[in-house]
């Protein structure tokens, strides 16, 4: 038993030392923060229980170090400490309660600041007589590397401030997500994440080289000032006055509802995490009063007056065990990696998208490789990077469809199966037809549809309406109640608006916005569209005159409404009594204000989901966009809005509340 403990301590010491080297020196960590912290905590626990095995070279004795021989080493004026950490809300609440108690005992009754924890590289800025004198990396907390000339190339670092004072500041240098992706694509050996890239750039020998890269900085703390400052709130305002870039999401909390306010703000930042233009890996809480900070003091590792609440990692490492090729309803071929189960952003991941052959070649991926998996927000998990190449070469997508064996055709970066009778394409099309956004046939899940195809009960969406559901009665999982619900759901789908049926047909480039454009230009029925498309030249001329319809979309519409298979389906649905015309005098009418307006939504709205509001506006002819661009006409803003508001303001885009649009949209229907 004792020998096992000694072996585990030795193993933990060795691996943590290796991880320290990878993180601080090589800027290429092989594990995430959570894995590292768990190992370090385990080592600390064992050493406290078995102190006879704690040696002077243990990583628990010292800070990690990013010191490099290429730069001059300079001793810090103050210890540059790390932060205490917690990974759960309960731990955060306990710390807040402790700080509230300490505040009351001291009689200072101070507040607490909350700000995003930027996932970048730490920097210490020294100003003398208002002039930037030196910039040091954190190093080992006692000594850092002098990277002054490189830091001077960062545009948001003032080289001189208005007052001739002394300042020692702490900040975080980072690179935006967008710039990280752009730069990483050009590198022979790409970086795992934006933090490592920023660190790698900062440590280039030539400041001229560094100037070519778009590094940025947030300054978040004053370690020393010749000014008299009592709180971090005062310091924050002073930093802004001097022209330093500070995080706009920093908030200060105090009073009776301090804890509730902090927890709500933390959850808001976590929810908005993916909308930030830079990477964050948590939030940092700090006592506001500098006097109380001094009273509370620090350990050798971290200040007692601050804590970091770490978010779940958006990335994880896994091994690719297989690569399969999927066929979509349009025939688009998508390679998917099957990976060993890994927890990423709170979800258990076993599959990850590989996009296309070009992406596979760029990453250099094959079965057996160790990869970084990312999952952000609702985005499908994807393979970001190969970190350990264990297989030779890159996986090659077969030249034939995995389902029907027809030769694949390349269009742009993607491969397509052009066989419209391909069983995989047909199954995916039926799934789309039954989905909530189209005909919304409740009870027909993807697995149920696959089962119906497998048993040869149906072979297209048309046969959903001719199939006798009673044939399912003796099959596993189908009882009388489920069968009756399925019958009712199929029958209910017959009353869906024409625009839902048109969307469900899966015509290329004919999405919700384009359908509404057609409807509100008097192309609001099957008969009007099909009649127009009989004369292809006249149809093309008319469609191109409609705002929002380009040549590609127009040609796809014309082709679809001259396709016998599609026309036969429409005629079948017509005979069955489905709605073949949209009511152009009711909710699909273009309002004089909303006509053709492109909009986006941010925040939450009391009493309304985003989907409901989007549908109400699009019914009136507005066009929904998922992102804020210069082409946007307005941004609809609710409570707890995100960074889209800031971006809209920067672009001069109008922002509206629900009150602003109530005259144009009936919010009560």
From Swiss-Prot:
SMART domains: BRCT, HhH1, LIGANc
Source organism: Borrelia hermsii (strain HS1 / DAH)
E.C. no: 6.5.1.2
Keyword ATP-binding: no
Function recorded in the entry: DNA ligase that catalyzes the formation of phosphodiester linkages between 5'-phosphoryl and 3'-hydroxyl groups in double-stranded DNA using NAD as a coenzyme and as the energy source for the reaction. It is essential for DNA replication and repair of damaged DNA.
Keywords, comma-separated and alphabetical: DNA damage, DNA repair, DNA replication, Ligase, Magnesium, Manganese, Metal-binding, NAD, Zinc
Single Gene Ontology MF annotation: metal ion binding
Residues binding Zn(2+): 401, 404, 417, 422
Coiled coil: none
Protein name: DNA ligase
InterPro entries per UniProt: BRCT_dom (IPR001357), BRCT_dom_sf (IPR036420), DNA_ligase (IPR001679), DNAligase_adenylation (IPR013839), DNAligase_N (IPR013840), Hlx-hairpin-Hlx_DNA-bd_motif (IPR003583), NA-bd_OB-fold (IPR012340), NAD_DNA_ligase_OB (IPR004150)
């Amino acid at each position: 038993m004792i020998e096992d403990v000694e072996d585990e301590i030795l193993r933990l010491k060795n691996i943590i030392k290796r991880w320290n080297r990878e993180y601080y020196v090589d800027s290429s960590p092989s594990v995430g923060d959570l894995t590292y912290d768990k190992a370090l905590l385990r080592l600390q626990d064992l050493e406290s229980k078995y102190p006879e095995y704690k040696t002077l070279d243990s990583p628990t004795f010292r800070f990690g170090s990013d010191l490099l021989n290429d730069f001059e080493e300079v001793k810090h004026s103050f210890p540059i400490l790390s932060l205490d950490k917690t990974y759960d809300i309960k731990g955060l609440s306990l710390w807040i309660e402790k700080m509230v108690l300490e505040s009351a005992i001291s009689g200072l009754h101070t507040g607490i600041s909350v700000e995003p924890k930027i996932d970048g590289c730490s920097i210490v800025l020294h100003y003398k007589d208002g002039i930037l004198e030196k910039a040091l990396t954190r190093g080992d907390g006692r000594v850092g590397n002098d990277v002054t000339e490189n830091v001077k190339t960062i545009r948001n670092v003032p080289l001189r401030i208005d007052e001739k004072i002394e300042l020692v500041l702490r900040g975080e240098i980072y690179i935006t997500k967008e710039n990280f992706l752009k730069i990483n694509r050009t590198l022979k050996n790409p970086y795992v994440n934006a933090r490592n890239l920023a660190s790698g750039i900062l440590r280039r020998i030539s400041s001229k080289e560094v100037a070519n890269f778009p590094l940025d900085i947030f300054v978040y703390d004053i370690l020393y000032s010749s000014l008299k400052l009592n709180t971090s709130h005062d310091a924050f305002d002073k930093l802004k006055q001097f022209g330093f870039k500070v995080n706009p999401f920093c908030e200060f909390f105090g009073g009776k509802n301090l804890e509730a306010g902090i927890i709500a703000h933390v959850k808001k930042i976590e929810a908005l995490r993916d909308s930030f233009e830079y990477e964050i890996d948590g939030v940092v809480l700090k006592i506001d009063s500098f006097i109380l900070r001094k009273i509370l003091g620090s350990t050798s590792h971290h200040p007692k007056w601050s804590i970091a609440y770490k978010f779940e990692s958006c990335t994880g490492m896994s091994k690719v065990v297989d690569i399969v090729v999927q066929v979509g309803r349009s025939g688009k071929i998508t390679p998917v990696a099957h990976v060993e189960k890994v927890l990423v952003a709170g979800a258990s991941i076993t599959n990850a998208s590989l996009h296309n052959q070009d992406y596979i070649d760029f990453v250099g991926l094959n079965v057996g490789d160790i990869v970084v998996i990312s999952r952000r927000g609702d985005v499908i998990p994807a393979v970001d990077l190969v970190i350990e190449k264990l297989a030779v070469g890159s996986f090659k997508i077969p030249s034939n469809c995995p389902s029907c064996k027809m030769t694949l055709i390349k269009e742009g970066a993607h491969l397509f199966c052009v066989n419209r009778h391909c069983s995989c394409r047909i199954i995916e099309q039926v799934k789309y037809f039954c989905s909530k956004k189209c005909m919304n046939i409740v009870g027909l899940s993807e697995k149920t549809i696959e089962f119906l195809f497998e048993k040869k009960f149906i072979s297209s969406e048309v046969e959903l309406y001719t199939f006798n559901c009673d044939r399912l009665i003796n099959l596993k999982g189908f009882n009388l109640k489920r069968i009756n619900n399925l019958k009712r759901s199929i029958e209910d789908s017959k009353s869906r608006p024409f625009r839902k049926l048109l969307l469900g047909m899966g015509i290329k480039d004919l999405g919700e916005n384009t359908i509404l454009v057609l409807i509100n230009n008097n192309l609001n029925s099957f008969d009007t569209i099909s009649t127009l498309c009989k004369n292809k030249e006249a149809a093309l001329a008319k469609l191109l005159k409609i705002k929002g319809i380009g040549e590609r979309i127009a040609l796809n519409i014309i082709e679809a409404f001259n396709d016998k298979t599609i026309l036969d389906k429409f005629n079948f649905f017509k005979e069955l009594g489905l709605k073949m015309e949209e009511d152009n005098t009711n909710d699909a009418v273009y309002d004089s204000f909303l006509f053709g307006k492109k909009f986006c939504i941010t925040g939450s709205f009391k009493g309304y989901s985003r989907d409901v509001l989007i549908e109400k506006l699009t019914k009136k002819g507005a066009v929904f966009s998922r992102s804020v661009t210069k082409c946007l006409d307005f941004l609809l803003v609710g409570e707890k809005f995100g960074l889209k508001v800031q971006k809209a303001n920067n672009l001069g885009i109008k922002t509206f509340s629900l009150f602003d649009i109530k005259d144009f949209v009936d919010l009560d229907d």
